[in-house]
Regions:
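Active-site core segments that coordinate phosphate-bearing ligands/cofactors
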Residues: 14, 51, 58-113, 120, ...
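Short linear loop/turn motifs
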Residues: 150-158, 270-273
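Residues that line or immediately flank small-molecule/substrate-binding pockets and catalytic motifs
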Residues: 24, 46, 156, 232, ...
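Active-site phosphate-binding/coordination module
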Residues: 8-82
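Short beta-strand to alpha-helix junction loop
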Residues: 128-131, 155-159
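Short, glycine/charge-rich flexible loops or terminal/linker lids adjacent to PRPP-binding catalytic cores
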Residues: 47, 160-165
Length: 437
């Protein structure tokens, strides 16, 4: 609400809004009563409380059956979080009328209609990829009544319209189509026009993500990466997103800024100082895993750490570089898993935002993975806006929607640094494995 009011205060007329697009952090749980009131604070994506519940469900439902139908372990995802509420907060669970994702809740507040999307069901581990329908067997295992699950529609297309309450609150005309809805990572891929099999998107915010589109139903037997329904999926033209999520990436960089630099440096200056140190950070290494259980490490949490600090050699600049290298190492670790499943990220597209604003990070990631990195003039907000316009018919084709998308920069691997970074990566892997023993 505050953001929309800020836009209106800058002279933009809300009457000019022709459609609404919504993007949100994936996997969060919102529980509503019959009056549409939240019953408890949302349990967000990186909250690890449901890990054991998800592991129990995988074995109880049957590992082979579960992976064949949902392509994922129930893990720490939304359905498992709701099962945690049922087990630990029965009074709250008894009052739930509908549960939904954070983006679904925003759509509800704007429209008065409780709904979700097929892509949303898949990120909750409530979609049966084999049967192309809701995975009621997961809900049944958890004791979740089917009537608690909202009706599901498409991601790109009008599934709801704003109501009079939203018009009174925000000024957006009642009846405006809500014509796009996607979790932050499918939306990031959409914002980069990553829609076809073989295309790969990445982002480096609080968490780091690599998202590869495929037309094949694929599951990682260890659930280190996950498969979800992409925004342009249909039964006749299947599109799935294989998602690598690393919880501890940008949040590590921001922690260093707060606690090491005491916020005396902005990110641009941090990047400049980091670049003054040679590749490999002269033996200093950073493990960034301190933001909850890591899926790519089989839901283990080795914690964050600064390794090999030499008080006579290393400076703040070394810590800054080692942090970005450690984050890039974590991307490399996950991308190797994706390659084992047939995803070949020879080209990685990213928006000019977050960690990808750092020339050092871009170059290090390219060198470690051997991939060409392409930087574009887009972000998640532009993606949701384009999706809304496409879904409402303002744009008639995808080509029209992305006509203004421009490639800003291409980064190729730096062969001169490859051997040093490979040596640093191998030492980093040994440290991570030691922490998981």
């Amino acid at each position: 609400c505050e953001g929309i009011r800020t836009i209106a205060a800058q002279g933009f007329a809300m009457s000019d809004v022709v459609s609404v697009g919504i993007t949100y952090q994936m996997h969060g749980l919102v529980c509503l009563d019959k009056q549409g009131r939240p019953l408890r604070p949302s349990i967000i994506w990186c909250d690890s409380r449901a890990v054991e519940i998800g592991a129990e469900a995988l074995e109880g439902i049957g590992r082979e059956f579960c992976l064949a139908h949902t392509l994922n372990s129930p893990g720490n995802f939304t359905a498992s979080k709701l099962a945690w509420v049922r087990r630990n907060e029965p009074g709250v669970f008894a009052q739930i009328y509908k549960f939904m994702l954070p983006g679904d809740y925003i759509a509800y507040r704007l429209s008065g209609r409780m709904s979700t999307s097929v892509s949303g069901l898949s990120e909750q581990i409530l979609w049966d990829f084999e049967e192309e329908r809701r995975a009621d067997f997961v809900a049944g295992w958890y004791g979740i009544p089917q009537e608690m699950i909202p009706e599901a529609g498409v991601s790109i297309g009008t599934e709801a319209r704003t109501d009079e309450a939203a018009e009174r609150l925000l000024g957006i005309p009642a009846g405006t189509p809500i014509s796009y809805r996607a979790g932050d990572q499918p939306n990031n891929a959409f914002s980069l026009n990553v829609m076809e099999a073989g295309e790969v998107a990445a982002t480096g915010g609080t968490s780091g993500v690599v998202y590869g589109v495929t037309d094949k139903r694929q599951a990682d037997p260890q659930s280190r990466v996950n498969t979800f329904v992409h925004v342009n999926h249909t039964a006749s033209n299947p599109r799935y997103g294989i998602l690598l999520c690393i919880n501890g990436t940008g949040i590590m960089n921001s922690w260093i800024r707060r606690n090491v630099t005491q916020e005396t440096l902005d990110y641009a200056e941090m990047n400049r100082q980091a670049a003054s140190v040679p590749a490999g950070s002269e033996g200093l290494s950073v493990v960034p895993f301190g933001n909850g259980a890591e899926r790519m490490l089989c839901n283990r949490c080795p914690r964050a750490g600064i390794i090999g600090l030499d008080l006579n050699r290393h400076t703040t600049a070394h810590i800054l570089r080692a942090t970005q290298e450690g984050i890039a190492y974590s991307f490399r670790y996950g991308i190797d898993i994706m390659r084992g499943l047939g995803v070949r990220p020879d080209v990685i597209r990213a928006g000019a935002a977050n960690l990808f604003l750092s020339p050092l990070f871009r170059q290090t990631l390219s060198t470690l993975t051997g991939a060409r990195i392409e930087l574009f003039n887009t972000d998640g907000a532009l993606g949701a806006a384009r999706g809304a316009a496409l879904g409402a018919g303002y744009y008639k084709t995808r080509g029209e929607a992305f006509a203004a998308l421009r490639r800003l920069e291409v980064v190729e691997p730096a062969e001169a640094d490859r051997e040093t970074l490979e040596e640093g990566y191998r030492a980093w892997v040994r440290e991570v494995e030691k922490r998981m023993e």
